[in-house]
C-alpha cells in the first residue's frame, strides 16, 4: 500500500457504513456503529458460531467489537500492581527503560512484560493472560496458533505521549519498506 493509494473518500465510505444488529445475532446491541457483546453470552454460545461471527465482524463489519465483562477488573488490578512493582525495581536498579517517544527517564516501560509478569507472579500471569474471551477473539481473527506479546508503557506526568504508529510487524519502517507489503496486512 502506497501513500498515494490512500484516499480520504475511501475511508469516508467505510465510516459511513452502518452496522446492523440483525446481521450479528450474537451481539447484544450496536453503539456508535460498534457491535457490543456480553461476555457471558459469548461464553455460553457454540464456539464455532462465535468464531465465525467475530471474524465476520472484524473483517467485513465494523472492524471492532466491544465485549462487556470480558476481563475481571480485579485481575487487571492485580497485574497492574505487579507491573508497578517491576517498574519500581527497574528504577531502583538504575535501569532507565523508556519508550521511543519521550526523553529517557520521562516515561516507564516494561519490555517483554509477558515473561516478566510470569516470573514475578505466575498466578497473576495465568489469570491475566489466560482470558477465554481474548482467546476467542484472537482465534477468530488469527487462527488457533496465534502468539501473544506484551509490553507495558506508562506515560508519566510531563512525559511525551506516543504518536500513532504500527508495532510489529510494520513498526518502524520506511514508507518504501511498508509499500512492499500487501494491503491486507496494513
Residue positions per predicted region:
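Fe(II)/2-oxoglutarate
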Residues: 1-60
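Short loop-to-beta-strand entry elements in the cores of soluble alpha/beta enzymes
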Residues: 66-68
